[in-house]
């Protein structure tokens, strides 16, 4: 098989096929994204939901890579409470690293001069992720069982096969990444094409396979960065990784098909298939739309209030006193985000001493929180209520092994 050494071998970089379908999906996504951001009125509730989505993002990114970590394990890891089981502890470390890098990435994107397509940015994501992992997780193995050390932030320095695809010669990676940056980061690309650009860039970066390991994580983080940069991340209220994990087989099949060469004279003019790249972009945008619509339905306020009520009616049966009153306070916090302690009397109709008991009960249960002993009460979404407030947010999907490279 020929070894790719010139960036022209990854043409086309944008598909010409299925233009009408991609335009239709773009319009639908922009409309759905606007509806989603209007679902949450309280800035504090928005932040709390975004925190849950960030945990969900690492949960699904881990699943795509063949690692399963429960939401409660992630919550414990955030409190530095690690499992004694080595595999579970490693998965917790992977989750922590992902969450930390995503937060860092969001902060860095506040600087408009940061080029999300730049090789330096990609290497930064890779370095920040791996430097947060313990030394045993700095090793990977090929499908032949050969172990090799992962160098944080360093481009691949060996040849590799990924499935049926042989990525470019490692010596040519700087040239490929420079072409990737200059084309996709071109300021002259119309905003109406940006979603297709994000989808196509996702595949072409996977095709380049710039790192020895960790490519999938970096590529998904970079796609998330692009959505944030172009105002399409819904203030952190949805994540692409949930859809990609849900349709993992379709995702990998679409990636692999788009690796294929041109299929005849009617399939574009580049080295690779235009039609297959268009199919991947359609899949990618359909996944985006599905996830935005899913979260929009989940955050519909009347429906969310009902799920809060049902949690207290059917799940919090261990609460023998003040369950109804605690439900009213919690429901109000889901609406408003924050209330004063004095409001509890008004909401429950109880005396001050009883209201104090209700507040203590809610704090002990974790259904709301406070910044200080006498501070206001704030909405909280601990892991134990995720499946009740946000059903199907964390799908119990089977763990499948990732595609390993051969060297």
Model features per residue range: what roles?
Residues 1-407:
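FIC/Doc superfamily catalytic core
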């Amino acid at each position: 098989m020929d070894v790719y050494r010139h960036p022209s071998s990854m043409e086309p970089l944008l598909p010409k096929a299925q233009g009408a379908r991609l335009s239709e999906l773009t319009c639908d996504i922009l409309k759905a994204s606007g509806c989603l951001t209007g679902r949450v009125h309280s800035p504090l509730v928005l932040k709390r939901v975004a925190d849950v989505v960030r945990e969900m993002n690492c949960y699904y990114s881990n699943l795509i890579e063949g690692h399963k970590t429960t939401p409660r394990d992630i919550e414990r890891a955030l409190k530095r409470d690690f499992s004694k089981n080595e595999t579970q502890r490693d998965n917790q470390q992977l989750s922590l690293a992902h969450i930390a890098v995503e937060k860092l990435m969001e902060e860095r994107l506040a600087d408009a001069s940061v080029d999300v397509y730049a090789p330096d940015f990609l290497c930064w994501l890779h370095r920040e992720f791996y430097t947060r992992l313990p030394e045993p997780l700095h090793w990977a193995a090929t499908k032949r069982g050969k172990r090799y050390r992962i160098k944080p932030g360093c481009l691949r320095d060996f040849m590799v096969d990924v499935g049926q695809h042989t990525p470019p010669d490692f010596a040519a990676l700087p040239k490929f990444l420079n072409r990737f940056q200059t084309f996709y980061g071109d300021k002259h690309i119309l905003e109406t094409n940006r979603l297709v650009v994000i989808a196509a860039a996702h595949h072409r970066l996977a095709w380049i396979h710039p790192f020895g390991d960790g490519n999938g994580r970096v590529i998904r983080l970079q796609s998330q960065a692009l959505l944030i940069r172009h105002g399409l991340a819904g203030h952190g209220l949805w994540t692409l990784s949930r859809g990609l994990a849900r349709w993992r087989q379709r995702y990998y099949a679409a990636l692999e098909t788009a690796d294929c060469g041109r299929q005849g004279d009617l399939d574009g003019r580049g080295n690779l298939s235009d039609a297959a790249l268009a199919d991947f972009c359609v899949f990618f945008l359909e996944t985006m739309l599905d996830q935005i619509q899913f979260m929009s339905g989940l955050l519909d306020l009347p429906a969310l209030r009902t799920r809060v009520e049902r949690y207290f009616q059917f799940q919090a049966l261990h609460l023998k006193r003040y369950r109804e009153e605690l439900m009213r306070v919690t429901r109000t916090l889901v609406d408003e985000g924050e209330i004063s302690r004095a409001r509890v009397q008004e909401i429950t109709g109880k005396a001050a001493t009883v209201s104090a008991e209700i507040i203590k009960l809610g704090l002990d249960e974790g259904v709301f929180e406070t910044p200080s002993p006498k501070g206001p009460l704030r909405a909280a979404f601990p892991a134990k209520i995720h499946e009740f407030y946000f059903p199907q947010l964390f799908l119990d999907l089977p763990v499948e092994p990732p595609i390993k490279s051969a060297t």
